[in-house]
Amino acid sequence: MVNAIVIIKGLGVEGKVTLSQECEGSPIYINGTVSGLTPGQHGMHVHEFGDTSNGCISAGDHYNPLHREHGSPLDVERHIGDLGNIKALSNGVATISIRDTIMSLFGDISVMGRTMVIHSDRDDYGRGNFPDSKTAGHSGKRVGCGIIAKI
């Protein structure tokens, strides 16, 4: 069993997210809460670098070691870092409960040490007609982020 934690920080945005995985090849469970968001849907992704030295910008692009197009968490063709959308209620709080079978805390494509990012807008899963739909889901600005750390 491997467990990790992410302390999300941003301008008015904060939260705590945990990741747990029994063994390599088993599903990963991602749970937590993020507050300070505008009500509605927000894209959530793991980005390639574990670097928040310049806020969330220094985290790089979506984590995509298999060089696939952006997609939804249910798509076979997707970035490993594509976690879809979280929904903030009218109080600005989003509760996260995700089971994912692509992402891993084990092996060569582990997300450990990388940055989880919450975006200002809804992820269009690569289905929009925007220039950044196929690469970033047209999810908007990075409003909060934190490094995935082993616990």
UniProtKB/Swiss-Prot annotation:
UniProt keyword annotations, A-Z: Antioxidant, Copper, Disulfide bond, Metal-binding, Oxidoreductase, Zinc
Disulfide bonds: 56-145
GO biological process: removal of superoxide radicals
Record: residues binding Zn(2+): 62, 70, 79, 82
Molecular function terms from GO: copper ion binding; superoxide dismutase activity
Disulfide bond recorded as keyword: yes
UniProt-annotated binding residues for Cu cation: 45, 47, 62, 119
PROSITE patterns assigned to the protein according to its UniProt record, in alphabetical order: SOD_CU_ZN_1, SOD_CU_ZN_2
Pfam families referenced in this protein's UniProt entry, alphabetically: Sod_Cu (PF00080)
InterPro entries: SOD-like_Cu/Zn_dom_sf (IPR036423), SOD_Cu/Zn_/chaperone (IPR024134), SOD_Cu/Zn_BS (IPR018152), SOD_Cu_Zn_dom (IPR001424)
This enzyme's EC code(s): 1.15.1.1
Cofactor(s) annotated in UniProt: Cu cation; Zn(2+)
Reaction(s) this enzyme catalyzes, per UniProt: 2 superoxide + 2 H(+) = H2O2 + O2
Cofactor binding description: Binds 1 copper ion per subunit.
Described purpose of this protein according to its UniProt entry: Destroys radicals which are normally produced within the cells and which are toxic to biological systems.
Similarity comment: Belongs to the Cu-Zn superoxide dismutase family.
Protein name: Probable superoxide dismutase [Cu-Zn] 6
Name of the encoding gene: sodF
